[in-house]
């Protein structure tokens, strides 16, 4: 597998236009071996962290954050043991959609300021949040944390236990347009789980943490990356440079374009984090590779002591030895108790499944939605939210992150006669074209068949007759830029932009190369839609001529003519028209 250096490419100091377009040759997937990028200053890292946070939120359909509605918490079925209690929980994380879980609380009086609290997502274990084996036990970790003085909410992955209004794996191209997928719902559930803990009496809102293993660790470090309320964490057996997650709930389009889990995990810095790893899974290199990279980020904050690692000779797990390391780490950083002997795991009473399941002999509340109803509710709420936004910079940011498009500060080029090739330094892309100099306002003409077809068009003939300078390009996968692109890797769109999103980028790159504030953008045929969205996200006004040919922004229009995941959630056609002045 091709190793990605510095996340993407290492080019010579003197940047040159590459011979091949890296978007066709360097195609990462969940099993690619990534190499962490080095950051020299805290400011450089903080800028990257801000960008990644918005990218993650956009990929999850949470940019902007949906309006939070009342959780209507139902807490019932209390079980009391000698020093802790367990209760069943249902909370309404979206109108008509319910997340199930169990709430574990200490029976001793709350200290001044309240108990610290922990959200406890689970991995892909057979019994979900009720898994209790030597390899992993969610009840054991929750009960022992409660005994140590934490309030713990162990909640379901989508499609597990009591959270059954969607399957665990769902969605397709239409849902992708609206950024509605298992990761979206699960991520949102995690945010609302923190809201739930904050709302409880006796909880210290300033001391909330998270821990989970495997898929639960993915939820843990993603939540910590975007929610600063997570003050301490222990993602177990997941942060890796060689495997990024194999389940739908860990992947969404755009989530890891130009990034990967080590960088996302480092976003926890400088808050305390324990990295648990094992020789028998994809975290086998943690002591020598992933941990040093993340510790280097902590060192930028002068907080290298806030991140630790435990590496076991074991298979994929969250076993007792790992859990005890987590108890000790949390004890030292949260409880102020550095005595490891205080954090030995004690045996637990295993409750009957029916005594733990919120929906045992119980139905979902009235008004609970079907899957189709939930998707319709998501779409309706997204439309209402985005249509109310009139701030142009907010809309432009939303569309830019859906497209993952940027206006390059520098564009390099090489020319031979009227043939030109453009590229963004250190990105490895290529934009071939035809450049005909002239006088007056420059024009960029984009045709779906490429530059040669544009050269023969009436639009270009008219421009040349007027003596104007004209650039015609082979946008990504058009004209001479057509090339094999292997899309067979796992979760292709999680790691790679779609062809249409790349075409928008090529248009922006070309406009930036022209360096003409009044350059006109002309889109022919299907390329008119590409040009509309490029003009919409450009940081300056772009005169646009584009006959959209009946494109109205319906879902089917995007599926047929402009497939970009998340584009509808980001405001879609109406936002683009507003920004482009069409």
Across the structure, where does each feature detected by a protein language model lie?
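Primarily recognizes the serine-hydrolase "nucleophile elbow" in alpha/beta-hydrolase
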Residues: 195-257, 510-581
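Alpha-helix capping and helix-loop boundary segments enriched in small/acidic/polar residues
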Residues: 130-137, 174-188, 210-221, 251-264, ...
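Loop/turn elements at helix/coil->beta-strand transitions in domains of secreted/extracellular proteins
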Residues: 114-117, 148-151, 204-207, 228-232, ...
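Cap/lid segment of the alpha/beta-hydrolase catalytic domain
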Residues: 110-199, 238-249, 443-513, 552-561
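Sec-dependent N-terminal signal peptides
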Residues: 3-12
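Generic beta-strand/beta-sheet core signal
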Residues: 104-106, 121-122, 155, 211-213, ...
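Alpha/beta-hydrolase-fold serine-hydrolase catalytic core, especially in secreted/extracellular enzymes
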Residues: 16-98, 276-441, 449-469, 476-517, ...
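Catalytic-domain carbohydrate-binding cleft regions of carbohydrate-active enzymes
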Residues: 207-250, 254, 258-301, 306, ...
């Amino acid at each position: 597998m091709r190793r990605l250096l510095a996340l993407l490419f290492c080019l010579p100091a003197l940047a040159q236009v590459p011979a091949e377009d890296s978007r066709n040759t360097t195609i990462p997937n969940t099993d690619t071996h990534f190499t962490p990028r080095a950051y020299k200053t805290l400011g450089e890292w903080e800028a990257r962290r801000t960008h990644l946070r918005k990218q993650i939120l956009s990929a999850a359909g949470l940019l902007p954050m949906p309006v939070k509605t009342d959780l209507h918490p139902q807490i019932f079925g209390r079980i009391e043991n000698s020093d802790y209690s367990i209760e069943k929980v249902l909370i309404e994380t979206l109108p008509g959609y319910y997340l199930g879980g169990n709430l574990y609380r200490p029976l001793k009086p709350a200290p001044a300021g309240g108990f610290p609290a922990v959200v406890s997502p689970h991995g892909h274990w057979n019994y979900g949040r009720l898994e209790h084996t030597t390899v992993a036990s969610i009840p054991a970790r929750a009960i022992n944390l409660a005994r140590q003085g934490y309030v713990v909410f162990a909640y379901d992955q989508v499609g597990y236990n009591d959270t059954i209004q969607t399957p665990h794996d769902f969605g397709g191209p239409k849902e992708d347009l609206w950024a509605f997928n298992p990761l979206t719902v699960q991520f949102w559930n995690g945010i609302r789980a923190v809201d739930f803990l904050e709302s409880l009496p006796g909880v210290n809102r300033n001391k909330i943490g998270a821990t989970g293993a495997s898929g639960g660790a993915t939820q843990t470090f993603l939540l910590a990356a975007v929610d600063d309320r997570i003050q301490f964490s222990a993602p177990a057996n997941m942060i890796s440079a060689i495997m990024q997650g194999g389940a739908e709930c860990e992947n969404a389009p755009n989530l890891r374009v130009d990034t990967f889990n080590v960088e996302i995990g480092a976003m926890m810095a400088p808050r305390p984090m324990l990295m648990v790893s094992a020789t028998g899974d994809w975290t086998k290199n943690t002591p020598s590779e992933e941990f040093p990279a993340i510790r280097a980020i902590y060192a930028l904050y002068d907080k290298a002591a806030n991140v630790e690692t435990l590496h076991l000779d074991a298979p994929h797990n969250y076993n007792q030895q790992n859990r005890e390391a987590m108890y000790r780490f949390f004890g030292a950083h949260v409880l102020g108790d550095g005595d490891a002997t205080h954090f030995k795991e004690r045996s637990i009473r295993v409750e009957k499944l029916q005594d733990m399941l919120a929906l045992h002999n119980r139905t979902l509340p009235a008004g609970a939605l079907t899957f189709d109803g939930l998707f319709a509710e998501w779409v309706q709420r997204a439309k209402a939210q985005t249509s109310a936004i009139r701030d142009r910079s907010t809309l432009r940011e939303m569309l830019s992150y859906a497209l993952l498009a940027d206006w390059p500060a520098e564009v390099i080029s090489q020319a031979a006669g009227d043939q030109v090739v453009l590229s963004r330094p250190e990105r490895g892309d290529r934009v071939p074209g035809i450049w005909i100099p002239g006088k007056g306002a420059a024009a960029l003409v984009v045709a779906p068949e490429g530059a040669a077809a544009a050269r023969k068009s009436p639009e270009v003939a008219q421009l040349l007759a007027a003596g104007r300078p004209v650039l015609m390009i082979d946008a990504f996968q058009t004209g001479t830029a057509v090339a094999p692109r292997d899309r067979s890797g796992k979760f292709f769109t999680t790691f790679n932009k779609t062809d249409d999103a790349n075409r928008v980028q090529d248009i922006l790159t070309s406009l930036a190369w022209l360096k003409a504030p009044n350059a006109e953008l002309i889109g022919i045929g299907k390329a008119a839609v590409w040009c509309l969205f490029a003009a919409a996200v450009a940081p300056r006004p772009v005169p646009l001529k584009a006959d959209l040919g009946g494109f109205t922004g319906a879902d089917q229009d995007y599926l047929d003519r402009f497939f970009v995941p998340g584009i509808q959630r980001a405001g879609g056609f109406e936002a683009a028209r507003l920004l482009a002045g069409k």
